[in-house]
Structures are given as C-alpha cells and as structure tokens.
Amino acid sequence: MGKRYVVALKDAVTGVLYGGGGTFRILIDEESSGAKHLSCLVNTMNRGTRGSEHKHDVEHLWYILSGKGTMYIGGKAYAVGPEMAVFAPAGVLHRIDVGSDEDLTYVVVYAPPGPEQQLKQFGARAFDQR
C-alpha cells in the first residue's frame, strides 16, 4: 500500500490503551503517510479511567473533542474538556484521569513522532514508569 495523505478514522491503526481503559487510533505517522516530523492519533479513554503517569522524549499536544477529565502535567492538575488544547513539553511527567460521566476523546500530536510506534508494539505497557 502506498502512502496516504488523507486517512479516515475507520482506517486507522487501532489498539488498546491503559490495560483495556481505552483505544488508540493512529491516523498519521511515517508508515501510513510518510510523516517524519509529527504523528497524529485520536484516542478514547473510557469514563472513570485513571491514566498512568509517564513522559516522552518528544513534545506532546492534545485537543479535547468530547468528555471531561483532569490532566496532570509536571505535578499540576488542570481541568480539561471539549475545545481545549493541552501541551506537555518533552521530558515532563503527565497523565490523564477521565471523569465518571462519559468517555474522553481527544486528538494527540507527537512532534517529532515516536511514542505512537511504542503504542503499536507494546500497547498500554509502552509508557509504564518502573
């Protein structure tokens, strides 16, 4: 299959987040589109899910599509919901806790790419802090 510049959500590479607490969908990465400087995903975390604290060696951006939760970035808590953008610098610990009312769906951008490949290979275990 050739590189795709337009990818429908239904055609994304999909896997399980957080030990069954949600789903990742990789829309844009080097494998699918040839993107060398960023990747783009759409993730859904199930309501009531508590994410595991982790960090990446790359910058990380979220854009919340639906649902509400709390983002912890560098030890500080932020209430987040639809139409909000969130940024975590490279190397900074972060996690997401989802509220109990509804699932949390958000766009993720990694720049440069990399963490999405760990998700493909290891799923939720990719970012365990041990």
Functional labels for PLM-detected ranges:
Residues 26-28, 41-56:
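Conserved short histidine dyad/triad with adjacent acidic residue
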Residues 75-90:
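Short acidic-glycine-tyrosine-enriched beta hairpin
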Residues 59-69, 74:
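Glycine- and acidic-residue-biased ligand/ion/polar-headgroup-sensing regions
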